[in-house]
């Protein structure tokens, strides 16, 4: 979703390569000819869907790729992007549906390109990944079984990354990374983007509760590497037909590892629950199914469970506040930036109105029902 560490600032420049320039990059950096190219939505980077032309030199390799051009701030952290890219490769080798990484002509996983705009020279990190099949789960009604599978996938991903090693792994300790759930108190400097209203009051209350209850509990949470952005546009699915004629969905792709950082298991499940609620007609029920799937791999401790409600509320606040702030910087990208806001404020308010105890009861009872083989 987002990528700059520290404060988001107007110094961050979102890339603005034309399709012709992007095609030229694919050829000059990766040695591949482009037959077709089209832009893909992105928060503050730039992505293109690229079809590769077959030539005598490139008879094998992928037919479709995604060209990823990082913004100027992210491009200043090549170690971090290198680690994230190697994680994608590691997970693919472990059987996860992540992209393959196309190497540059110099056999690297990324390349730094400089662009002279006349007044200054700006540098952008570029990568090329294989294009994954499927459609975002945002496009389908998600039933309990798929929610369970997504929760399970999130836990398996974090658990698998316990075995990941890289000499630059420490770059995932991203101090003050605005999208890490630990950074919720940093939202205060962006609250002006909301104006003065009920939404802002709720966010202010959540931030205060986070400081009082979560910050004091962090030492009791189990650490791990988080994907950090398992939203309904970053998980792809393909469908097939069951013996009874029903649609059966299978996860075919996990996208966008740009928000990876060290966090906690409970952060990952909270983030996943929040994003699975966005398009749901029964959002409060979602959490129990995702939690059941997650806990089938990584059972939460009582302290972690006790923080879950507030962590889900906190992720809503992060997404909603930073979207409002980013809209002021990039009004032309408003439709993409405000995806969460369409239902997010309503869901956050509903959670707040119901209160922690009532929501937890629904989540934990639903999760418990899976233990006895009855899903609610």
UniProtKB/Swiss-Prot annotation:
One of its GO terms (cellular component) is cytoplasm. It catalyses: (5R)-5-hydroxy-L-lysine + GTP = (5R)-5-phosphooxy-L-lysine + GDP + H(+). Keywords: Cytoplasm, Kinase, Transferase. The active site is at 229 (proton acceptor). It is an enzyme of class 2 (transferase). Coiled coil: none annotated. It comes from the Eukaryota. Its EC number is 2.7.1.81. One of its GO terms (molecular function) is hydroxylysine kinase activity. Disulfide bonds: none annotated. The keyword Protein transport does not apply. InterPro entries: Aminoglycoside_PTrfase, Kinase-like_dom_sf, Pseudomonas-type_ThrB. It is found in: Cytoplasm. Catalyzes the GTP-dependent phosphorylation of 5-hydroxy-L-lysine. Belongs to the aminoglycoside phosphotransferase family. This is Hydroxylysine kinase. It comes from Bos taurus (Bovine). The gene is HYKK.
